[in-house]
Amino acid sequence: MVNVQSFEEDKIQLISIHLLDVENDSYMNLFWALEDAIQEINSNVSSAVVLVDLSDVILKPKSLGVGYEFYFISDLISGIKFPTIGIVDSEAHLALLELFLCFDIRITNRKSRFSMSHILEGFTPTDGGTQRLPRIVGVGRAMDLLLTGRCFSAEEAMEMGVVQYLFPKDVVGEAIALGSQIAAHGPIAAQYLKEAIMNGADMTLSQGLSLETDLNVILQSTFDRAEGIQSFLNKKSPKFLGR
């Protein structure tokens, strides 16, 4: 149900989720297994970036029963302190698209299709669809997608900012390559960048700038910052340790 693979000395963590049975018990078992996996990854000092493959996931909120709304997988994903990359190599509709939107970077197959067609079944998004989607694509486009429930292509998703990368094949392999690029940089700096962007988005510009300054000051005291400076002066590649 939840499989974790590590690459490049644990810097890249790949979580593959398998949920094709949408009954409530299966969902809850997945939730607890994923929670354990994420806690372990967050406590691993070697971790730098987390990839999550959602290609074998089906989520239909109406079939999950009472209690689903209190156990959102998206809350677990949002609690990952490292940069996250969401992977969909098929299609993402309804709650699966809502979950997909909570990742920092999203990649998909060129043939993928998406929709938030909750309204066609007489209900509304329950996992952030009405909040994350307009923040990503804008209010007007979100209104269109949510009120019509229409399907849209991977190309349109790319144009709107729903996804950042399209690949014709081997989407997981391409995601690992992207993760490798991110993991090669300072892991603490990457965490602080994520914190500044995600938290700053809900602040005024002045508050966001103050947060950016505070995180920069904290970063100055780390080993990785000193390593970066010394490597630049000595014209060699830095060896970041995440401390």
Where are these regions (language model features)?
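Terminal low-complexity tails and localization/encapsulation signals of metabolic enzymes
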Residues: 1-2, 230-243
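Glycine-rich beta-to-alpha active-site loop
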Residues: 71-125
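Well-ordered beta-strand positions
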Residues: 99, 104-105, 144, 148-150, ...
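Alpha-helical segments flanking ligand/cofactor-binding loops in enzyme cores
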Residues: 75, 97-98, 131, 143, ...
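C-terminal long alpha-helix characteristic of the crotonase
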Residues: 107-112, 154, 163-210, 217, ...
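Terminal peptide-recognition signature
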Residues: 15, 34, 52, 100, ...
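Hydrophobic, secondary-structure "cap" segments at the distal end of domains
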Residues: 130-140
